[in-house]
Amino acid sequence: MWKYKYQSKNYFVKRAKQVEIAEKVRTIHRQLGRMDPSLILPLVQSDDEQLIVQMWQEGSHGANFAHKKDRKESLRLLIALHDTHKKIAWQRVPGLHTYSQLLKWQMRHMRFKSRRNELRTFLTKEEIDQILHYSDKSLQLIALEDAPEKEITLLHGDVVHHNFLWCSDGQLRLIDFDLAHLGEADDEYILWLHRVLPAVDYDLGKIFAELPELKRLDKRKLHRLKYPNELLREWLFAIDLPLEQQLVFLDYLVPFTKRALTYWPKLWYDIDRFVKK
């Protein structure tokens, strides 16, 4: 995504990887454009069918999950998005499909495991073993889940902090729907928690105390928080970066990993406690 100036106006511009993705994004925006209050930034028409264009938001910035207000407002926005299934028949919208979160995570686990020798350049054997242990054990628990199916709705697909944009009018809106798909809302609340927990020292009790809206999340799915998703994804991304970019990213990722692994035993214990409540 980049800033583009045309005839004295500034725009957000992003080129979708495929025309089909751009068309999916436009379809989603047409549907969500009917919602009030607005959950999105409207699209600006473009002659290039692969371009996604929106008005530039002066002074805008992404959410910061270290801030309580941003956690609360981003969850509120996600809930509003998921609740649109009450007005929009998302399963009839072309270009939207479901996928298995468990299968995706199993594949990620296997990819990490297959590259453990390369990862030894950056992580100790013990750290790699820990990540694989938590990953393997959590996947076993997820496979045993006995949670009833819930309503299928639209999921944003990438709930990283910068896709929640504080706009010029002071409202928080969702951007970048490239990875949007169909699924159960609980699956996306889990992914949102994966993103938020590092910002609160993995304090699950704190998050649930400040956000009673999370009661809608089926406790039987909390085992999914035991899966070290952020670590697996970020390392698989980092290992293929060009050297200069890799060195910069590792300055963040190595301490992030060491810190996460110190919290994981307590997080595991807290999750078990919450599931039994």
Give residue spans per PLM region.
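Active-site acidic catalytic loop and adjacent metal/ATP-binding pocket
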Residues: 1-8, 139-187
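ATP-binding pocket architecture of kinase catalytic cores
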Residues: 6-90
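Conserved aromatic-histidine-acidic binding/catalytic patches
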Residues: 17, 66-69, 151, 219, ...
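A glycine-centered beta->alpha junction motif in the catalytic cores
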Residues: 51-65, 87, 108-118, 232-243
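A cross-family kinase active-site recognition segment
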Residues: 68-126
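Long, hydrophobic, amphipathic alpha-helical segments used as structural scaffolds
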Residues: 85-93, 142, 146, 239-243
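An alpha-helical support segment within catalytic cores of ATP-dependent transferases
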Residues: 108-156, 263-277
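Active-site activation/catalytic loop segments of kinase-like enzymes and analogous catalytic loops
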Residues: 186-243, 247-263
